[in-house]
Amino acid sequence: MTYPNLLDRFLTYVKVNTRSDEHSTTTPSTQSQVDFATNVLIPEMKRVGLQNVYYLPNGFAIGTLPANDPSLTRKIGFISHMDTADFNAEGVNPQVIENYDGGVIELGNSGFKLDPADFKSLEKYPGQTLITTDGTSLLGADDKSGIAEIMTAIEYLTAHPEIKHCEIRVGFGPDEEIGVGANKFDAEDFDVDFAYTVDGGPLGELQYETFSAAGAELHFQGRNVHPGTAKGQMVNALQLAIDFHNQLPENDRPELTEGYQGFYHLMDVTGSVEEARASYIIRDFEKDAFEARKASMQSIADKMNEELGSDRVTLNLTDQYYNMKEVIEKDMTPITIAKAVMEDLGITPIIEPIRGGTDGSKISFMGIPTPNIFAGGENMHGRFEYVSLQTMERAVDTIIGIVAYKG
């Protein structure tokens, strides 16, 4: 189905810079997200028909569409995030390419282009309307496409009371891209049986498995002496960092793994001979494998300290989120419903693990099973990001189908 306000709504959203800041100590991490929620989303939530609309100190804008059929007793939530990834989000100037011809798309005057030879996903979209960047910023389809789709679904349901639906709760939140947005999510206040994050990629994505994730911060303490007299005295902290890294499995890196394979990812190294620091992220799907990866890093640190004769390697491990499959597989109702709705709409569900996490990873462990459904974005987090308007329309169809489902 086509929705006349969907495109303009999306274009309005992406032109607002809501980039999050991982170094911030506030919630949300940037004032722009507060302004976007209170000045743009809250008024529009009220206009499209949501009731009891409010903004919480945790950065979430919340609203409710009451059920219009007493036989539909479920309460279902839909969640999308306001922030965008760590890439330029100022001056977003989207291009709308109608009836895409399957060829190269020049991204404004930037010199960058979307070429099917480089981005095979473009082969799915001839004849469709694509929204791209102008090459100077990201687009923000992750996840403003999700926000626009949820808002449009509510607008349509309000205008068509003949479509019977259950109670719907909507939540638009901050800071998903920096991994802390759901930390303060109020599951008791949201009060639904289950929810969906509308934060996926291409048409048909339906996901209920994520990585389990941890961060590892390492400090290496060296001893700096003049290199001319260093023998037997100098301890080079940078060399310790190299030695530690070289003891990790050489093929367990993001660029060499796929599917259900986990990894260690070295994110940053800084330092000097005297001291050095390294930051890693650890990812795996199975709980035992995840715990084994953390234990392996600790074992390497302990072994190095033993060989060095002092505690020169300090490791701090912090769990970040867990595979929501552990929660959702106990009651697959949200997956069963979404899958049935997609199939009724002629959409082939793509059920595969997310090699990442969503807000749903944390919210699921707060007591609300929250799988993820497609929002349409491709090549997210950079200048080559784009989204199909037709896929966004199908996401709206799916949301409407889920809340009207009577099975």
UniProtKB/Swiss-Prot annotation:
Q: Which reaction does it catalyse?
A: Release of the N-terminal residue from a tripeptide
> For this UniProt entry, what's an example GO CC term?
cytosol
Q: Name one Pfam family in it.
A: M20_dimer
SUPFAM superfamilies for this protein: Bacterial exopeptidase dimerisation domain, Zn-dependent exopeptidases
Q: How is the cofactor bound?
A: Binds 2 Zn(2+) ions per subunit.
Active site at D83, E176 (proton acceptor)
Q: What class of enzyme is it?
A: hydrolase
Positions of Zn(2+) 1 binding: H81, D142, D199
Q: Its GO biological process terms?
A: peptide catabolic process; proteolysis
Q: Which UniProt keywords apply?
A: Aminopeptidase, Cytoplasm, Hydrolase, Metal-binding, Metalloprotease, Protease, Zinc
Q: What are its cofactors?
A: Zn(2+)
User: In which residues is Zn(2+) 2 bound?
Assistant: D142, E177, H381
Look up the EC number in the record and give it.
Answer: 3.4.11.4
Intracellular or extracellular location(s): Cytoplasm
Q: Which HAMAP family match?
A: Aminopeptidase_M20 (MF_00550)
State the function annotated in the UniProt record: Cleaves the N-terminal amino acid of tripeptides.
**PANTHER family, per the entry:** PEPTIDASE T
What protein name applies here? Peptidase T
